[in-house]
Design a protein with these regions (language model features):
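Sec-dependent signal peptide recognition
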Residues: 2-9
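Surface-exposed, beta-sheet-biased, low-hydrophobicity segments with strongly acidic/polar composition
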Residues: 20-196
Protein backbone atom coordinates (compact mmCIF):
# COMPACT_ATOMS: atom_id res chain seq x y z
CA UNK A 1 0.00 0.00 0.00
CA UNK A 2 2.77 2.40 0.98
CA UNK A 3 4.62 1.51 -2.22
CA UNK A 4 1.48 2.25 -4.29
CA UNK A 5 1.00 5.65 -2.65
CA UNK A 6 4.70 6.44 -3.11
CA UNK A 7 4.63 5.55 -6.83
CA UNK A 8 1.45 7.58 -7.32
CA UNK A 9 3.09 10.58 -5.65
CA UNK A 10 6.15 10.27 -7.90
CA UNK A 11 3.98 9.97 -11.01
CA UNK A 12 1.96 13.05 -10.04
CA UNK A 13 5.14 15.02 -9.34
CA UNK A 14 6.54 14.07 -12.74
CA UNK A 15 3.27 14.97 -14.46
CA UNK A 16 3.11 18.33 -12.68
CA UNK A 17 6.74 19.07 -13.57
CA UNK A 18 6.16 18.16 -17.22
CA UNK A 19 3.08 20.38 -17.45
CA UNK A 20 4.90 23.27 -15.82
CA UNK A 21 7.77 22.99 -18.28
CA UNK A 22 5.36 22.91 -21.22
CA UNK A 23 3.54 25.99 -20.00
CA UNK A 24 6.66 28.15 -19.76
CA UNK A 25 8.54 26.79 -22.78
CA UNK A 26 8.71 29.24 -25.68
CA UNK A 27 7.70 28.11 -29.14
CA UNK A 28 10.86 28.63 -31.24
CA UNK A 29 10.72 31.62 -33.59
CA UNK A 30 12.13 31.33 -37.09
CA UNK A 31 12.27 33.09 -40.45
CA UNK A 32 9.08 32.85 -42.48
CA UNK A 33 8.49 33.79 -46.13
CA UNK A 34 4.97 34.65 -47.26
CA UNK A 35 3.19 35.92 -50.35
CA UNK A 36 -0.02 37.91 -50.27
CA UNK A 37 -2.07 40.17 -52.52
CA UNK A 38 -2.90 43.76 -51.68
CA UNK A 39 -5.13 46.37 -53.25
CA UNK A 40 -3.35 47.85 -56.28
CA UNK A 41 -5.21 51.17 -56.18
CA UNK A 42 -2.79 53.87 -55.00
CA UNK A 43 -5.49 56.29 -53.88
CA UNK A 44 -8.41 54.33 -52.42
CA UNK A 45 -9.87 51.10 -51.12
CA UNK A 46 -9.04 48.81 -48.24
CA UNK A 47 -5.63 48.04 -46.83
CA UNK A 48 -4.63 44.38 -46.48
CA UNK A 49 -3.86 43.92 -42.78
CA UNK A 50 -1.20 41.50 -41.57
CA UNK A 51 -0.50 39.79 -38.24
CA UNK A 52 3.06 38.71 -37.43
CA UNK A 53 1.77 36.52 -34.61
CA UNK A 54 -0.59 34.53 -36.86
CA UNK A 55 1.42 34.90 -40.08
CA UNK A 56 -1.69 35.67 -42.12
CA UNK A 57 -3.80 38.50 -43.49
CA UNK A 58 -6.43 39.77 -41.05
CA UNK A 59 -10.02 40.61 -42.11
CA UNK A 60 -10.72 44.32 -42.59
CA UNK A 61 -13.54 43.90 -40.07
CA UNK A 62 -10.82 43.54 -37.39
CA UNK A 63 -9.14 46.86 -38.25
CA UNK A 64 -10.21 48.36 -34.90
CA UNK A 65 -8.41 45.66 -32.90
CA UNK A 66 -4.95 44.49 -31.85
CA UNK A 67 -5.15 41.53 -34.26
CA UNK A 68 -2.97 43.20 -36.92
CA UNK A 69 0.42 44.92 -36.98
CA UNK A 70 0.69 46.63 -40.36
CA UNK A 71 -1.41 47.13 -43.47
CA UNK A 72 -0.54 47.56 -47.15
CA UNK A 73 -2.30 49.15 -50.10
CA UNK A 74 -0.35 49.57 -53.34
CA UNK A 75 2.97 50.71 -51.79
CA UNK A 76 1.55 52.49 -48.75
CA UNK A 77 2.10 51.01 -45.29
CA UNK A 78 -0.01 51.78 -42.24
CA UNK A 79 0.98 50.78 -38.71
CA UNK A 80 -1.49 49.70 -36.00
CA UNK A 81 -1.08 52.71 -33.73
CA UNK A 82 -2.10 56.33 -33.25
CA UNK A 83 -3.75 57.61 -36.48
CA UNK A 84 -4.13 54.18 -38.10
CA UNK A 85 -5.25 51.82 -35.34
CA UNK A 86 -5.76 51.17 -31.62
CA UNK A 87 -2.53 49.21 -31.14
CA UNK A 88 0.91 50.20 -29.92
CA UNK A 89 2.86 49.32 -33.05
CA UNK A 90 5.99 51.23 -34.06
CA UNK A 91 8.49 50.75 -36.87
CA UNK A 92 11.84 51.87 -38.18
CA UNK A 93 13.71 51.05 -41.37
CA UNK A 94 17.38 50.19 -40.93
CA UNK A 95 20.05 50.44 -43.60
CA UNK A 96 21.28 46.96 -42.75
CA UNK A 97 20.87 43.60 -44.46
CA UNK A 98 18.12 41.43 -42.97
CA UNK A 99 20.55 38.75 -41.75
CA UNK A 100 22.72 41.36 -40.01
CA UNK A 101 19.84 42.57 -37.81
CA UNK A 102 20.11 40.20 -34.84
CA UNK A 103 18.17 42.26 -32.30
CA UNK A 104 15.70 45.12 -32.18
CA UNK A 105 16.77 48.57 -31.04
CA UNK A 106 15.02 49.95 -27.97
CA UNK A 107 14.54 53.43 -29.50
CA UNK A 108 14.26 55.23 -32.84
CA UNK A 109 10.77 54.02 -33.78
CA UNK A 110 8.01 55.95 -35.56
CA UNK A 111 4.23 55.68 -35.78
CA UNK A 112 1.51 57.04 -38.08
CA UNK A 113 0.94 60.53 -36.69
CA UNK A 114 -1.87 61.45 -39.12
CA UNK A 115 -3.57 59.92 -42.17
CA UNK A 116 -1.04 61.72 -44.39
CA UNK A 117 2.01 61.41 -42.11
CA UNK A 118 2.91 57.74 -42.13
CA UNK A 119 5.77 56.11 -40.25
CA UNK A 120 6.96 54.40 -43.45
CA UNK A 121 7.62 56.59 -46.47
CA UNK A 122 7.43 54.78 -49.81
CA UNK A 123 10.73 55.85 -51.31
CA UNK A 124 12.56 54.73 -48.18
CA UNK A 125 12.35 51.10 -49.26
CA UNK A 126 11.81 50.88 -53.04
CA UNK A 127 12.36 52.34 -56.48
CA UNK A 128 9.47 52.41 -58.96
CA UNK A 129 9.52 51.95 -62.72
CA UNK A 130 6.45 53.74 -64.11
CA UNK A 131 6.80 52.01 -67.49
CA UNK A 132 6.74 48.43 -66.17
CA UNK A 133 4.80 49.44 -63.03
CA UNK A 134 7.33 47.42 -61.08
CA UNK A 135 8.44 48.08 -57.50
CA UNK A 136 12.03 47.13 -56.76
CA UNK A 137 12.83 46.79 -53.06
CA UNK A 138 16.10 48.51 -52.18
CA UNK A 139 18.69 45.97 -51.03
CA UNK A 140 19.81 46.22 -47.43
CA UNK A 141 16.58 47.73 -46.04
CA UNK A 142 15.20 45.96 -42.97
CA UNK A 143 11.96 46.93 -41.24
CA UNK A 144 12.00 46.47 -37.46
CA UNK A 145 8.63 46.51 -35.71
CA UNK A 146 7.31 46.77 -32.22
CA UNK A 147 4.04 44.92 -32.85
CA UNK A 148 0.52 45.97 -31.83
CA UNK A 149 0.84 43.81 -28.70
CA UNK A 150 4.35 44.99 -27.80
CA UNK A 151 6.51 42.19 -29.23
CA UNK A 152 9.27 42.47 -31.84
CA UNK A 153 9.56 41.50 -35.50
CA UNK A 154 11.91 42.21 -38.38
CA UNK A 155 10.87 42.13 -42.04
CA UNK A 156 12.30 42.42 -45.53
CA UNK A 157 10.35 43.07 -48.73
CA UNK A 158 11.70 40.58 -51.26
CA UNK A 159 9.36 41.35 -54.16
CA UNK A 160 6.39 43.55 -55.04
CA UNK A 161 4.97 42.46 -58.39
CA UNK A 162 2.03 43.92 -60.37
CA UNK A 163 -0.75 41.33 -60.60
CA UNK A 164 -4.41 40.74 -61.41
CA UNK A 165 -7.10 39.73 -58.90
CA UNK A 166 -5.91 36.10 -59.06
CA UNK A 167 -2.30 37.00 -58.30
CA UNK A 168 -1.13 36.35 -61.84
CA UNK A 169 1.56 38.70 -63.22
CA UNK A 170 0.46 41.50 -65.54
CA UNK A 171 2.49 43.68 -67.88
CA UNK A 172 1.66 46.99 -69.58
CA UNK A 173 -0.64 48.03 -71.06
CA UNK A 174 -2.70 45.95 -68.59
CA UNK A 175 -3.13 47.87 -65.35
CA UNK A 176 -2.57 45.84 -62.19
CA UNK A 177 -5.47 45.52 -59.77
CA UNK A 178 -3.27 43.93 -57.11
CA UNK A 179 0.33 44.00 -55.94
CA UNK A 180 1.73 40.60 -55.00
CA UNK A 181 4.16 41.00 -52.11
CA UNK A 182 6.76 38.48 -51.03
CA UNK A 183 7.98 39.17 -47.50
CA UNK A 184 10.50 37.54 -45.22
CA UNK A 185 10.05 38.10 -41.50
CA UNK A 186 11.03 36.91 -38.04
CA UNK A 187 8.52 37.33 -35.21
CA UNK A 188 9.92 36.95 -31.70
CA UNK A 189 7.12 35.23 -29.79
CA UNK A 190 8.77 35.39 -26.38
CA UNK A 191 8.69 39.19 -26.22
CA UNK A 192 12.45 39.75 -26.19
CA UNK A 193 14.16 41.90 -28.87
CA UNK A 194 16.39 38.98 -29.90
CA UNK A 195 16.14 37.77 -33.52
CA UNK A 196 18.45 34.75 -33.18
Amino acid sequence: MKRSIYLTAIAMTMLFTACTKEEVADVPSSDQTIEFLVNGNPSGGNFTLFSFEKGVAVPTADSNSLKWDFGLRFETFIINSKASGPGNAFVQILNQPYTAVTSAALSGYKFDTTASQKAIKGLEWYTYNSITRQFSPIAGKTFVFVTANGKYAKMEVLKADPANDNGEPVTPPTRPTRIKYTLRYFYQKNGTPNFQ
